[in-house]
Structure formats: structure tokens, C-alpha cells
Amino acid sequence: MITSYIGYAVFYFTRKSFNFVMPAMLTDLGLQKADIGIMGTAFYLTYGVSKFLSGVLGDRSNPRYFMGFGLMMTGVVNILFGMSSSVFMFITLWMINAFFQGWGWPPCSKILNTWYSRNERGLWWAIWNTSHNLGGALIPILSGAVALYWGWRYGMIVPGIIACAIGFALCFLLRDRPTSMG
């Protein structure tokens, strides 16, 4: 559970990093608030579709690779976002990020249902469900501080690098069921 907890918390790093670098982006690139609105709308529409599709795909996949690959992809997208400058690329990349963001929850749900009995699930789901609070609480500090000292681009790139590293680790450390522990 610890591995999926950390992994899902880091999904929030790559989901919310944009929120904390956006003011600097507006100033640095001269973006309009409407551009930011389009990015947000495109993200949430794509994320909604992805949550449905990834639930179907996640049922047929090994959670460790599904979640790990999804997190690595959101990391790559955040890195590319930090290297981009055009509104078109921002929107495109943020939609790709949204698609892979949908890959976080289904494997976690599958793992929690596999690892814990009905009588235990309430407690473990409650504990696990704080993972997004942890990720959401840490990313403003991380992304904001990095953006303050090294610019908004690194405020996207650094969380992306962390996501790639944790996603890679998930592929080796996350276990889909107790029997896979040996």
C-alpha cells in the first residue's frame, strides 16, 4: 500500500504543478487568461474521458506497470511542458497529461480490493485516500519554490523528473496481489 500511496501522491505533483507556475507563465510569456482557461477546460474534459477508459484498461492490466507507465508519462509531459512556449503546445501537452493522469486511480483501486478483505477495506481506503492530500500539500511548496528560484519552467520540469523516477520505481516495487510477494 505504501508504494501505491506514494505513487498516487506524486500523480498530484504532475497534475497540480501548473497551478503554481501559472502566474509566472502569464508574466513571462504574456499569455492571456483565456489561454489558461482553455488549457484547464481541455485538461478536465480529457481527464474525464481518460478516467473511464483507464478503468476499462486497468481491469485488464497489471497495476504495477499500468500505474508506473502512467506516472512516467505524466512526468515526461511535465518536462516537455516546461520546455515549451506556444499556447498550442501547452494545450496539447496538458491534454496528454490529463489522459495519463487517468491512469493513477484504477490500479490503486484494484490493488486495495485485492490486498484487503471487505472487513479491512474501509480503514485502508481511508488511510490511502490521504495520498492525494499529501501530494496536493507538497506540490505548492516544491513547484512554487523551484519556480521562485529557477523560473516557472523548472517548476514543471522538477516535478516531472520526480514523477519519472517514482513511476519507474513503481514498475519494480508495486505488487498487484499478495501472492506476487512470494
Where are these regions (language model features)?
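Cytoplasmic helix-loop-helix junction between adjacent transmembrane helices
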Residues: L93-L134
